[in-house]
Structure formats: structure tokens, C-alpha cells
């Protein structure tokens, strides 16, 4: 709570002095949680207006670099509220996935639980969370939601994800017998979840083409097929060598999707740039 009063500013000054005595080269920040006033607001909502009420520490000028935990819809207003102070998103997303599990349909965003302080009685009976990037906590966002905002504005310097790896404890949105978190883009065994490839397609120069989910469903069931790709203009999807059409990213979307009825066989995707095959 001290970040919301003058004690927080005083403590920050004391800590900054200690750090400066040891290291004069690095910027000093704090992960403010939350950076804006959430009082009397439904916690399922994020601020989307420029006149947000920032906490005292954020507005004090003590920090070299303002750090935001969550509140992703306020990011784009940072420059007009703090024109001389750099920004970094110190904790973001809290997206939820279980590797290898997929709920249909995939184009509906879900916030699980509805509120952090209300017991969760929804979700899946086997305590899984869809591995499509469609579920997050109410205080967070999907990975695509936050990265699109950061990517759009040059004055937003970057983001730290909650989290890189799953870990034991905090099995949000579930309770026992769940024991592992669902937050990681890599699971406890070290295997990447699908959203890992979204970041790979955005943050590296490596040609990426990743399609999912698995291809083992009930005959006739409609299945959403996603693809993350980079270094290419388009992707063509094939089932048993029959084309299911060419897709391109639209607007600021970071993935493409086909919705098709399942039938047994082999899926294949080909990405192309200027008509030349890049990945298969």
C-alpha cells in the first residue's frame, strides 16, 4: 500500500540512494502493482482513458524508469502523462494455458477467474486451460493483447512476461488438486506451449511456421487451426494434400486461423514470401 502514499516515495528515495552508492550506471525502476487506481472499479475491467489516477510513486519523479504491472490498456497513455519518463512493463499478461489441450471455439476471450477474490467454480472438469491464447486472469491479458500494444508504440520500451516457465504453486484459476501454475510459455517439463512460437515469430529473425492443435478429433467436429509465422507473406494449409486456402495476417493480428470440420489425415502448412516457399 505504501506506493499509494508519501511513505512509498520516501522509501523509494532511500532505496535509490543505496543502489546509487553501489552502481551509478543502471536505471532504477519499481514494478508498481497496480500503477493506476483500481479502487471502486470492477477488477475485470482495465482502464482505457487518459485521465487515469496514477499512484503516488509513479507520479513522483523518483524513478528513472516507470514500471507497470498489468493495466495494459493504460500503456498507450504513458507518454502524454509522463512525457519525460521512460516506461517498461515490469509484469504482464498472466495468460493461462495447458500444453496440448484445446477448447473449441478459440476466438472467445475468457477471464478466469471472474474476480481474483471470488472462488472459481468454472473452467474445465479436468482442470485444464485451453492452449490457444484465449484465456487470462482478470487483472492480466492474453499474450497477444499486451504485445500488440507494446509493439504499436515506440515509446513503450518492452515487457516482462508472467511467466517464462510454469512453476509449482499458484495454480490459478484452480485449486487443489492442481499444483502447477498455468502462466508459463514453457511447461514444467521444459516443453514450449504454442504461444512460445508467437514470441519467437515476433522477437527473432528466424523463419517461424507453427500450426496447432493436434489432429485427433471426432469426425465432423469443427476445429480451429492456428498458425504463427514470420518472414513470410502468407500461409497455405493442406489436409491430405488438398488446399484449405491461403491466409494472411490482418491488421495487427499476430496469428491466422482456419475453422474446418475434422476428418482423418495429415495436415501440412506452407509459408511463402513473394511466391517462394519459406517454411513447410
Regions found by a protein language model. Give the residues of each.
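Extended substrate-binding grooves/exosites of carbohydrate-active enzymes
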Residues: 1-250, 255-276
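Short beta-strand elements
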Residues: 279-280
